């Protein structure tokens, strides 16, 4: 998926709309949540991690999902975060697994990112989460200084 860079500019040249449309457009939408979320073995949309934006064909988008603190079950288990299209069972765009190999609770921040294109139109992106076991209290820990983010950025033409 190579980027389609802009042209070189020269002094005195006229900046055209075609050239302007080749620049990145930046943040298309974002979702932020400071509410903790208790994990289950069923993949569901994590609290607050859903957004929509209007995509244009042939443009490159970066989607990022960040959880400041994922707390595992208190036994050996996996915590999974996924970026999906449409809903909790939609097309997987990116996925990450945090494995706790010990019989003790473990914690870690998690970050996923993906570069992709879409057809023109409305696009819904969700961040989902699940765990393999629920022994203890596996959760996504958030508060006013540790908040989850789901972000879509337009990087320019593809």
Regions found by a protein language model. Give the residues of each.
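Terminal beta-strand-rich extracellular "head" domains
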Residues: 34-39, 54-55, 60-158
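Extracellular "spike/adhesin" assembly and maturation modules
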Residues: 1-28, 47-52
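Short, polar loop/linker segments at the starts of domains and inter-domain junctions
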Residues: 39-47
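Disulfide-bonded cysteine-rich modules in secreted/extracellular proteins
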Residues: 27-35
């Amino acid at each position: 998926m190579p980027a389609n860079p802009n042209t070189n500019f020269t002094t005195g040249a006229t900046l055209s709309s075609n050239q302007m449309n080749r620049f990145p457009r930046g943040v298309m939408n974002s979702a932020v949540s400071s509410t903790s979320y208790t994990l289950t073995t069923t993949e569901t949309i994590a609290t607050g991690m859903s957004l929509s934006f209007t995509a244009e064909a042939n443009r490159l988008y970066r989607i990022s999902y960040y959880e400041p603190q994922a707390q595992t079950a208190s036994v050996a288990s996996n915590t999974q975060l996924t970026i999906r299209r449409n809903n909790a069972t939609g097309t997987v765009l990116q996925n990450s697994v945090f494995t706790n190999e010990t019989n003790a609770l473990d914690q870690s921040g998690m970050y996923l990112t993906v570069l992709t294109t879409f057809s023109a139109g409305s696009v819904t992106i969700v961040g989902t989460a699940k765990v393999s076991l629920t022994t203890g209290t596996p959760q996504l820990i958030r508060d006013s200084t540790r908040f989850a983010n789901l972000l879509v950025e337009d990087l320019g033409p593809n």
